[in-house]
A protein has these predicted regions:
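A compositional signature for long Ser/Thr(±Pro)-rich, low-complexity
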Residues: 1-173
Length: 173
């Protein structure tokens, strides 16, 4: 039985007395849509030093947590650190300068999330980190018409495309 929404789905398996919950946390850190300095109003702002409060609220009730993420950092976002705008992805502003890149923001967010989980005194569960997934689309990327729907088995090691960006993102986990 599936009860939920895009943000959270819940399946209960009566014969095993087991519940599986899928919690959607795009960036694993707190986000805001509030206006912030000169960042565009419609832009998602990531508070890199604050874990996702929805995930942290559920954490004490979770026995096994599987974390999978990273690809959302390629979306248009602003990065906040210490209450200041420190970078962004797919937008710029003369006052921002170069700012921190997507990869550094991802590393900070991973550290924030994993540290918060590891030090939560009420969480007694097991955490499994699924590393940043390699490129797996045929005929283009996810946003240029590529598809992964024809995949019928896991890729063999020699079939995986080696991409420096993917390898960097994995190393930051």
């Amino acid at each position: 039985m599936n009860k939920g929404s895009k943000k959270m789905q819940r399946w209960y398996f009566r014969s095993f007395d087991t519940t599986i919950i899928r919690v959607w946390s795009s960036w694993l850190v707190n986000t805001t849509s509030e206006p912030w300095e000169y960042a565009p109003a419609n832009l998602t702002k990531l508070k890199l030093e604050e874990p996702d409060p929805n995930l942290m609220e559920l954490l004490p009730r979770i026995d096994v947590l599987v974390i999978s993420g990273g690809h959302w950092f390629a979306k248009k976002t602003a990065y906040l650190l210490g209450g200041k705008l420190v970078g962004g992805q797919l937008w710029s502003h003369k006052n921002l300068g170069k700012g921190i890149p997507e990869t550094e923001a991802f590393g900070i967010a991973m550290e924030t999330s994993l540290s918060s989980i590891a030090t939560d005194p009420l969480y007694k569960g097991l955490t499994i980190l699924r590393t940043y997934s390699p490129d797996h689309y045929d005929g283009g990327t996810w946003n240029t018409g590529g598809s992964c729907t024809e995949k019928t088995r896991p890729s063999r090691p020699w079939e995986v495309a080696h991409n420096p960006h993917t390898e960097l993102m994995r190393s930051l986990q």
